[in-house]
Amino acid sequence: MRIVFRVLMIAAVFAVVSARPAVAQGDAEKGKAVYAAQKCTGCHAIAGAGNKNIPLDGVGKKLSAAEIRAWIITPKEMETKTKSTKKPPMPDRYSKLPAADLDALVAYLATL
């Protein structure tokens, strides 16, 4: 029963992810502020600033906005799906970001 519930929850998350706009126009500047406020540089780097172990340079060219969003809100599922071995693993606390902040963060990362 727990497995069925988990599968349904994952399906629901992907339904929500695909139903949202891929990138909220004009939110990239706010997304840059969200990136800083959430202290993403503890694990990630952009243009050499931050933790260089997991650089995000070019992430917007490598991943769609929906994939970026999925990495933020369902990192464990994305790690499994992509067989990622990056350490430390992405924490799952960002799924609780307010929708406007999440949209802005995705918009910012999509510009990289």
Sequence positions of predicted segments:
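The canonical Cys-X-X-Cys-His
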Residues: 31, 38-46, 68, 105, ...
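Positively charged n-region of N-terminal signal peptides that target proteins for export
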Residues: 1-6
